[in-house]
Design a protein with these regions (language model features):
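Amphipathic alpha-helical segments at domain termini/boundaries
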Residues: 30-58, 209-241, 250-259, 286-287, ...
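Helix-loop "lid/cap" segments that line or gate small-molecule binding pockets
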Residues: 203-204, 255-258, 274-279
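Conserved CoA-thioester-binding segment of acyl-CoA-metabolizing enzymes
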Residues: 23-95, 134
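Catalytic-core regions built around general acid/base machinery
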Residues: 77, 128-139
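Glycine- (often His-adjacent) and acidic-residue-rich active-site loop
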Residues: 94-132, 263
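Terminal peptide-recognition signature
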Residues: 56, 74, 92, 104, ...
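Crotonase-fold acyl-CoA enzyme core
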Residues: 134-247, 281, 286-289
Length: 302
């Protein structure tokens, strides 16, 4: 990736031209897609489509707790965007000073009075969060977490589940469940796959908060930027990604997560098959021809 900087010394990708069709060149726009009407999904989740980038913003003040309503809205948006080929990148951001405090403990506590002590509700809420993380991994588009503030528990899980994570220098992260007698078992799944193993265990066993620099050292985030540049840097990453072949991105993202769970020999065997099929795909042929012909490729819709 080609990187650049500015007067603030922020290292980030150079903006790349999006060579696919523009919205004005399409008969079918976002407004034509039922799942992406002008109305917001609900007040808890804000949606903004800008060319090939969809930004979903958590909006549940004061701490953007992942209530059932917010998670249902987020799950629905991820399901909807999965089939919208015009969108190449999804950014997940948040309003306020907290990215997300995780599950809505007040909402969950209310259900302790249920006949089963809240078991059914707890399972539904925790499983819904897990399903969202799986949707992110399976989404054909790249997903970037845009963090400014605290990401804790299931909020940290959300960050760890995204393909990339970019945060401000004042952001902090933790999995504090152990502090209240509730080990962060489901956040552990994402965290152990994003961060280095020993560091993930450190976060899970101590419940202590780490700063942005430590999160980057742990492998939880990709980049740290000053707050005023956060959106700009995320947008530039999104532009770089959106300029690539959607076919290659879809194939590559799926292959990345699948091979990561395989033994080494099996992973190579699988990856050989994936790469052979990718070589036969139209975009690979176009990309190679464009490279040899010293011109920009013209990607086809996947």
């Amino acid at each position: 990736m080609v990187l650049g900087g500015d007067a603030a010394g922020v290292e980030r990708p150079q903006a790349a031209a999006y060579h696919g069709p523009t919205y004005g060149e399409r008969e079918k726009t976002m407004a034509d897609v039922v799942a992406f009407k002008k109305e917001e999904p609900n007040g808890l989740l804000l949606r903004e489509a800008n060319g090939p980038v969809l930004r979903l913003t958590l909006n549940n003040p004061p701490a953007n707790a992942l209530s059932i309503a917010l998670m249902q809205a987020l799950a629905a948006e991820l399901d909807a965007v999965a089939v919208v080929k015009e969108i190449k990148v999804v950014a997940i951001a948040a309003t306020g000073k907290v990215f997300s405090a995780g599950h809505d403990l007040k909402e969950m506590t209310l259900h302790r009075a249920d006949e089963d002590g809240g078991k059914a509700f707890f399972e539904g809420a925790i499983r819904l969060a897990a399903d969202i993380m799986l949707k992110i991994a399976k989404l054909p588009q790249a997903v970037i977490a845009e963090i400014d503030g605290l990401a804790t528990a299931a909020g940290c899980q959300l960050v760890a589940s995204c393909d990339l994570a970019i945060c401000t220098d004042s952001s902090t992260f933790c999995t504090p469940g152990v502090n209240i007698g509730l080990f962060c078992s489901t956040p552990m799944v994402a965290l152990s796959r994003a961060a280095h193993r020993k560091q993930a265990m450190e976060m899970l066993l101590t419940g202590e908060t780490i700063d942005a620099s430590t999160a980057k050292d742990f492998g939880l985030v990709n980049r740290i930027v000053p707050q005023q540049y956060l959106r700009q840097v995320v947008d530039k990453y999104a532009a770089v990604i959106a300029s690539k072949s959607p076919q290659a991105l879809k194939i590559g993202k799926e292959a990345f997560y699948r091979q990561a769970e395989m033994p080494l020999a099996d992973a190579y065997d699988y990856a050989v098959g994936v790469m052979v099929e990718n070589m036969l795909a139209g975009d690979a042929q176009e990309g190679i021809d464009a490279f040899l012909g010293k011109r920009l490729p013209e990607w086809k819709e996947d």
